[in-house]
Amino acid sequence: VVDYMLEGKVLDASCPAMTVTNEALRKVYDNMDYFSKHLTLRQSEVANSPEVIRRLGVIAMNTALECDLYGNENSSHICGSALMNGIGGSCDYIRNGYISIFTTPSTAKGGKISAIVPMCSHIDSTEHDVDFIVTEQGFADLRGKGPLRRAEEIINNCAHPDYRPLLREYLKLAPMGHEPQHMRAALAFHDTFLRKGDMRLTDFSEFL
């Protein structure tokens, strides 16, 4: 964001705190005349105020570690237990903003991990609070859609092509219901990665 501000791509910024690299902090100090007019630090009671966020019609963009087929997202825990990030004020923004967007690369670790999974290993934001999921593959607009339509959008538009057949296979295995899930296979991607080191090696027959 510091570079975007210096390039004129972001005009102003407001935040309760700054956590930047030493290099970015040096740029702020070296351009203090500019940043003193365009960067505002406010206490979290103001920056994360639901009333202020709603009144401004904020477009909330947050980062996810993984998203599942129905629009739930995990932004904090790896494989359900290892803490990677805190959620900060994201819940204040996604629930009160005009639009909530979660972004993530479709894969990690050279393709061995899919960010689109049958079921998240941990959930920070539920399907009720997520409007859009965006990866480098495209975006899924989840607004006003039922579970199966959301799943189709996410697979077709957000999942990496290497994982789309596996995700479609999971949907076929899941028993019918409002939100189809196969309890033994729901975390097969994660289990396979922990055992074999690559989610692409998932064989659902091992979980049936």
For each predicted feature, which ranges?
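Conserved alpha/beta enzyme-core scaffold
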Residues: 1-208
